[in-house]
Amino acid sequence: MMSKNYHIAVLPGDGIGPEVMTQALKVLDAVRNRFAMRITTSHYDVGGAAIDNHGQPLPPATVEGCEQADAVLFGSVGGPKWEHLPPDQQPERGALLPLRKHFKLFSNLRPAKLYQGLEAFCPLRADIAANGFDILCVRELTGGIYFGQPKGREGSGQYEKAFDTEVYHRFEIERIARIAFESARKRRHKVTSIDKANVLQSSILWREIVNEIATEYPDVELAHMYIDNATMQLIKDPSQFDVLLCSNLFGDILSDECAMITGSMGMLPSASLNEQGFGLYEPAGGSAPDIAGKNIANPIAQILSLALLLRYSLDADDAASAIERAINRALEEGIRTGDLARGAAAVSTDEMGDIIARYVAEGV
């Protein structure tokens, strides 16, 4: 299919990270063989595993390894073992946030899909769940109220106050809007931009610039929606949405709402990208230390993270689609890990990985 050589930095991390990563790498093997792709991998410690082995959550060797790669496949970090450490030395804040900053990962892509056969897990009304949904939440990661200056606290007594500042620059809005429109072209050609342009100056600028960028994509339909209405519409009829384009704060809220209405966090991948197309790909859920090592974790979010990596960093859409079809097939056949079994027979983490890898190899 392609002759280029690719290299992936693999960071399994903690908890269920290593065992679900093993399944993703089985699937990668199947992709390599079926599509004749030349992809190599190198493993590096991160999070708690790196603290145990190197005394810090993000060793220089790990950062260096990621710099030499085309993309990073990340597992999960954290657990009770390291909770006594100062916050910036704990696995989550000491590894993931510095990686995002170092590689200037400004866009976060969170797909949320209700798979056929899993409607019973959706907390929405049955008639709404029956319509299904397949949403991609595109969130700006480095601007907005989380990073704007000034921020702080001052004064005392009745006059004590705290303040944060929502700041967006034109270039930040333009580049995240382009990610959303490009993503929509690979999907159902619709972008819904979320703002609060009836109140906020930053949202007024956001809407103006998104309208400008939309003229570059005449094949993509654009709609605008206020954040308060969007949270309601996601509950009322999520099937109306394709790509949601959001600022940092609004995307933080909506991507979690999208995840929740699928009813299955173990199924949701996440991608964080920079302007060069370099990305860090990880499951949206946590390290689940309570089930680590028991061979019962759901590896699908990690495997779907690999699919996103293939699509967005390696431009291998065929391979990504093959993985997604294999997962659909497994779920349609009633194959479930324990989190989705509901009394039915459950397969192990290893078995689920084997089945999906086999289906990729067979070209289902």
Swiss-Prot record:
GO biological process, one term: L-leucine biosynthetic process
InterPro entries per the UniProt record, alphabetical: IsoCit/isopropylmalate_DH_CS, IsoPropMal-DH-like_dom, Isopropylmalate_DH
EC number(s) reported in the record: 1.1.1.85
Cofactor binding, note field: Binds 1 Mg(2+) or Mn(2+) ion per subunit.
Reactions that this protein is recorded to catalyse: (2R,3S)-3-isopropylmalate + NAD(+) = 4-methyl-2-oxopentanoate + CO2 + NADH
Compartments where found: Cytoplasm
Cofactor(s), names only, from the UniProt record: Mg(2+); Mn(2+)
Annotated pathway: Amino-acid biosynthesis; L-leucine biosynthesis; L-leucine from 3-methyl-2-oxobutanoate: step 3/4
List of residues binding Mg(2+): D228, D252, D256
Residues flagged as site, Important for catalysis: Y146, K196
Positions of substrate binding: R100, R110, R139, D228
Family: Belongs to the isocitrate and isopropylmalate dehydrogenases family. LeuB type 1 subfamily.
Subunit structure: Homodimer.
Protein name, as recorded: 3-isopropylmalate dehydrogenase
